Design a protein with these regions (language model features):
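Second-shell loop/turn segments in exported
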Residues: 62-65, 76, 108-114, 130-133, ...
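Bacterial Sec-exported substrate-binding components of ABC uptake systems
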Residues: 18-74, 183-212, 278-279, 295, ...
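Extracytoplasmic ligand-binding site segments that recognize negatively charged/polar headgroups
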Residues: 89-99, 138-142, 157-172, 207-232
């Protein structure tokens, strides 16, 4: 019996020691969002972003030159006024910012390919401090080439965050990258205050209209899962999303028949791509005409700020989540902000 007690005591000591070490390890990281952490230790900067980790010498900070392969991250750089730190960009046709477009025309920012096919020689020649991008599994070999040539590849998947303000919070990391932490924190605090004020206003609305999102691609309807930032927008804007009880953190696909069944009481259909009229939408897929919301409800696309292929919802909208929320509130509850115009959304007539 005595031996068993000693064994139990030893096991407890090991358990609490492991817990202590685990807590110390966790507390040494600065958390920006549930998916984004960094720490500075032993002359190195460490970053955890989603399922990815990287490190580089602290002396690299602040970055002088970066290459951006995903235009959704340009909104953070523009908000900080650090556009001239960009030395290269992929998918230039998707850039909305007038300042960045001008820098490209002046050859101060080099185009380094499309968002799926990069000019490796050009990227390597630019000798940037870091490459910023979303992670694309099919480009894993390309990322390895960057690393072997001494380029820090930083994966930032802000679009996978579950809450809008968590997307905004990425500006804190960009502030760290460019040595403007105080400015980044101030911007975040202003947007957070605006967002929470708007959310509280929406909570006072007398109704929660039913909402459908997404559209058909091929034979499947793709729409936001119930644990995505889009679903959180709908909730914070005082709407009743048809997938509010769904547990998926990414977009999911459903058949048209499933959507038809779930959307009988829907009053608003939002988050469509670049359509300008209901007729154009119907020409794309005549089945839409069977939906009650198509005939009797209101439909909104995310293209009020669109220039060719460039859509500012995916650029400045990544950080200005307060403006996106205000759009949704104005859509779902027209009695709010009667004198304001929509920023990112546009109604299809």
């Amino acid at each position: 019996m005595k031996a068993k007690k000693i064994l139990k005591l030893l096991l407890l000591l090991v358990f609490f020691s492991c817990q202590k070490n685990k807590n110390q390890e966790t507390s040494s990281w600065t958390q920006i969002t549930p998916k984004l952490f960094f720490q500075e230790r032993e002359e190195k900067f460490y970053l955890k972003s989603g399922g990815h980790e990287c490190s580089f010498p602290k002396e690299k900070l602040p970055f002088k030159k970066v290459i951006v392969l995903t235009t959704s991250q340009l909104g953070y750089i523009s908000a900080l006024g650090e556009e001239e730190r960009i030395s290269g960009i992929a998918g230039a046709q998707y850039v909305y910012s007038e300042k960045i477009r001008n820098l490209i025309q002046e050859n101060k920012i080099q185009t380094v390919g499309t968002d799926q096919k990069y000019n490796l020689e050009k990227i390597l020649a630019l000798k940037a401090d870091a490459v910023l991008t979303n992670y694309m599994p099919n480009l894993a070999d390309t990322y390895e080439i960057f690393r072997k040539n001494g380029i820090n590849v930083i994966f930032l998947d802000e679009y996978l965050e579950e809450k809008p303000l968590e997307k905004t919070a990425y500006i804190k990391l960009f502030g760290k990258f460019f040595g403007v932490e105080k400015k980044a924190e101030k911007i975040y605090q202003e947007i957070e205050t605006n967002y929470l004020t708007l959310k509280n206003q929406a909570a006072k609305a007398g109704n929660s209209p039913a909402v459908l999102s997404g559209e058909m691609f091929g034979n499947h309807w793709f729409l936001a899962g119930g644990k995505t930032f889009a679903a959180q927008y709908f909730k914070d804007a005082g709407a009743d999303y048809i997938l509010k009880n769904n547990q998926d953190e990414k977009s999911i696909s459903m058949s048209f028949e499933e959507i038809f069944s779930k959307s009988q009481s829907v009053q608003y259909w939002v988050n469509l791509s670049n359509y300008t009229t209901k007729k154009e939408l119907l020409n794309k897929n005549p089945a839409y005409g069977k939906l009650r919301v198509f005939r009797e409800g209101k439909i909104f696309a995310m293209n009020n700020r669109q220039k060719g292929d460039a859509n500012d919802y995916f650029e400045s909208g990544a950080i200005r989540t307060d403006l996106v929320l205000r759009d949704y509130i104005k859509i779902f509850h027209p009695e709010f902000f009667p004198n304001d115009t929509l920023v990112y959304m546009k109604e299809l007539k």
